């Protein structure tokens, strides 16, 4: 093979391999001119893509890393629209391209939160991003080779647009990667010089990247002319000589492989590659279902791993759908069962209404009833009759709840629809009563910090300003000058509580509703707060302390004091996922409620959680409406 010839010509050491892979002097000059042309082709583009980021990396961290290179116009960490979790990549925009070039040279593959980042020019044209020209595929890579090592190896052949090692869910290398060159000539040069060479003592394959659609089309053609045969149930006593004798009688072979374990013992299966397709078909027909040393053999076309997994997945889905269709309308769900009810008693209670095929009470690991179970009838008519007769009937002193059983995904979908309808109705009522902002202005996802005294434009804005997932600076400020913190009407630049506040503090709210101050709680004749309503089960400690503080504070500080107590509770909610920016926005929305209502729920965990969920739903609906527009 050509790979072996190239491998023999290549030295074994890593240093020598790298030297062997480097282009000639004339090629180096060509590469230099390509780099120059690349920079010219970038035009005025000063936007960088930053990938391989830890989910906890924020705009603030990236700003502090990139701003020393040159004035940064904006930083945006891309997040999921619903969960607000980082997608692992971001965009950094500089004022001029020279700063972007320097950042690419100095910061590419530098560690951010102990993970090397991957930086390349942001390519807004999807046609250029998806083009296959200049894209090469490298496999059989040593696990120790990372993105930087791959980039260093292949950068000698031309300007690289992107370079990536494929990894699993744990971040470990999968042994292959991709390098996208600016020109097809650079890609061809890399293939000629590196294909079949040793990298970290492993011979690598380098070839043009073939899109998956083209690979699948080619694969379908290969399936109709296969020559590789898989044979199993050979037993563990078979020898290589016996296996070769078994398969060679059908025709000439290219290779024969009997699988063995670490100890060299056969594992019971093997592969045979025949030279002709017709011979492979003949071997399958001749070996399938035949006896060999007491075992019935199986022979068939050798399949790729992903192909076998896909077939198993399809078989599982078909079996699952068959079961679901079989039990549709005949399986009942029963809950509120007494602990004394077991399978036999459950069957006896429901037996008068039809023929029962199965009855099961669900139990925990200790064998104790979970209080619910299932009964399956032979026909939908019997199941419907049982629901009519047994629903709300007293059994062992407890009324039963009996309905047709539903799949978990159907049940979840119906529940989400019910919650959404309920939240929409509640939000409409609150908007009509002024409980929550009825109108959102400005562009969500962009936050403009400005000079001291800056106010976000628009009325009806959210108390924390628009979604501060994108940080922007005023046009061309002095280099290394950060925007001020604690901007009225919004969070500080990074979406966290402003400096000067205690841990868990909350920033003061700026003017809203067209410049009018936010509504307060229950002011007295001189604007003093009358205090929170008393609860029947005793005053809550948090609400009581807030009430005392409000009585001694000016009216304009009421929202601030309540926010300082409310913000840490919102931040601790599971749905917020520790996102300080998101917690700030939701807290600001809750502060649009009357203070009296806030104090009523601030110590009620379920009540506060319901209000938070309503606010999250309202915010997500707003984002979706903006996308539709």
Swiss-Prot record:
Query: Which gene specifies this protein's sequence?
Result: PAB1
Listed A to Z, the keywords are: Cytoplasm, mRNA processing, mRNA transport, Nucleus, Repeat, RNA-binding, Translation regulation, Transport
Q: Please list the residue ranges that the record marks as compositionally biased, kind Low complexity.
A: 493-506, 514-531
Q: Which InterPro entries match?
A: Nucleotide-bd_a/b_plait_sf, PABP-dom, PABP_1234, PABP_HYD_C, PABP_RRM1, RBD_domain_sf, RRM2_I_PABPs, RRM_dom
A cellular-component GO term for this protein: cytosol
Q: Localized where?
A: Cytoplasm; Nucleus
Record SMART domains: PolyA (SM00517), RRM (SM00360)
Q: Where is the composition biased (Basic and acidic residues)?
A: 26-42
Name of this chain's protein: Polyadenylate-binding protein, cytoplasmic and nuclear
Q: Which residues form the RRM domain?
A: 46-124, 134-211, 227-304, 330-407
Q: Where is the PABC domain?
A: 542-624
Q: Which PANTHER family match?
A: RNA BINDING PROTEIN
Give the region (Disordered) as residue ranges.
Answer: 1-47, 465-543
Lineage from the top down?
A: Eukaryota, Fungi, Dikarya, Ascomycota, Saccharomycotina
- Family to which this protein belongs: Belongs to the polyadenylate-binding protein type-1 family.
Query: Which CDD domains is this protein grouped with?
Result: RRM1_I_PABPs, RRM2_I_PABPs, RRM4_I_PABPs
- GO molecular function terms attached to this record: mRNA 3'-UTR binding; poly(A) binding; poly(U) RNA binding
A GO BP term, please?
Answer: mRNA processing
What this chain does, per the entry, is described as:
Binds the poly(A) tail of mRNA. Appears to be an important mediator of the multiple roles of the poly(A) tail in mRNA biogenesis, stability and translation. In the nucleus, involved in both mRNA cleavage and polyadenylation. Is also required for efficient mRNA export to the cytoplasm. Acts in concert with a poly(A)-specific nuclease (PAN) to affect poly(A) tail shortening, which may occur concomitantly with either nucleocytoplasmic mRNA transport or translational initiation.
């Amino acid at each position: 093979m050509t790979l072996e010839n190239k491998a023999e010509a290549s030295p074994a050491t890593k240093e020598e391999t790298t030297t062997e892979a480097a282009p000639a002097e004339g090629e180096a000059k060509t590469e230099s001119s390509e780099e120059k042309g690349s920079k010219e082709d970038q035009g005025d583009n000063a936007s960088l893509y930053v990938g391989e980021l830890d989910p906890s990396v924020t705009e603030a961290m990236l700003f502090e890393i990139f701003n020393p290179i040159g004035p940064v116009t904006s930083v945006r960490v891309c997040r999921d629209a619903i969960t607000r979790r980082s997608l692992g990549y971001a965009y950094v925009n500089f004022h001029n391209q020279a700063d972007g070039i320097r950042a690419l040279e100095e910061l590419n593959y530098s560690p951010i939160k102990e993970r090397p980042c991957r930086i390349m020019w942001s390519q807004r044209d999807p046609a250029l991003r998806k083009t296959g020209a200049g894209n090469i595929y490298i496999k059989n890579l040593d696990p120790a080779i990372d993105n930087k090592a791959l980039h260093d190896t292949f950068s000698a052949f031309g300007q690289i647009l992107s370079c990536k090692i494929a990894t699993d869910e744990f971040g470990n290398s999968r042994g292959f990667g991709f390098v996208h060159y600016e020109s097809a000539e650079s890609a061809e040069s890399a293939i000629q010089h590196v294909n079949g060479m040793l990298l970290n003592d492993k011979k690598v394959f380098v070839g043009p990247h073939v899109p998956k659609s083209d690979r699948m089309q080619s694969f379908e053609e290969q399936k109709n002319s296969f020559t590789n045969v898989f044979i199993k149930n050979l037993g563990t006593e078979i020898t290589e000589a016996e296996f070769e004798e078994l398969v060679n009688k059908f025709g000439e072979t290219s290779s024969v492989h009997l699988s063995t374990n670490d100890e060299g013992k056969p594992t019971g299966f093997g592969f045979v590659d025949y030279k002709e397709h017709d011979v492979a078909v003949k071997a399958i027909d001749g070996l399938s279902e035949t006896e060999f040393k007491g075992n019935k053999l199986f022979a068939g076309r050798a399949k790729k791993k992903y192909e076998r997994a896909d077939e198993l997945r399809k078989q599982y889905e078909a079996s699952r759908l068959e079961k679901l269709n079989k039990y549709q309308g005949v399986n009942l769900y029963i809950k509120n069962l007494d602990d004394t009810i077991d399978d036999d008693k459950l069957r006896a209670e429901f037996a008068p209404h039809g023929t029962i095929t199965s009855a099961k009470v669900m139990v925990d690991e200790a064998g104790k009833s979970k209080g619910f179970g299932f009964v399956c009838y032979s026909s939908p008519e019997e199941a419907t009759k049982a629901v009519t007769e047994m629903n709300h009937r007293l059994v062992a002193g407890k009324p039963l709840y009996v309905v047709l059983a539903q799949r978990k995904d159907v049940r979840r979908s119906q529940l989400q629809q019910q919650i959404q309808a309920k939240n929409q109705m509640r939000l409409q009522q609150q908007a009509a009563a002024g409980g929550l902002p009825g109108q959102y202005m400005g562009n969500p996802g962009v936050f403009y910090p400005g000079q001291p005294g800056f106010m976000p434009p628009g009325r009806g804005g959210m108390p924390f300003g628009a979604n501060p997932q994108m940080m922007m600076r005023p046009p061309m400020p002095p280099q290394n000058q950060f925007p001020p913190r604690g901007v009225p009407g919004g969070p500080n630049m990074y979406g966290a509580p402003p400096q000067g506040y205690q841990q868990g503090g909350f920033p003061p709210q700026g003017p809203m509703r067209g410049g009018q101050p936010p509504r307060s709680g229950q002011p007295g004749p001189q604007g003093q707060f009358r205090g929170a309503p008393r609860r029947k089960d005793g005053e809550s400690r948090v609400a009581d302390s807030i009430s005392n503080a409000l009585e001694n504070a000016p009216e304009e500080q009421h929202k601030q004091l309540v926010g300082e107590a409310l913000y840490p509770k919102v931040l601790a909610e599971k749905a917020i996922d520790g996102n300080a920016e998101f917690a700030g926005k939701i807290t600001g929305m809750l502060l649009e409620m009357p203070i009296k209502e806030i104090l009523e729920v601030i110590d009620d965990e379920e009540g506060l959680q319901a209000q938070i969920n309503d606010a999250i739903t309202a915010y997500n609906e707003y984002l979706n409406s903006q996308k539709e527009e």
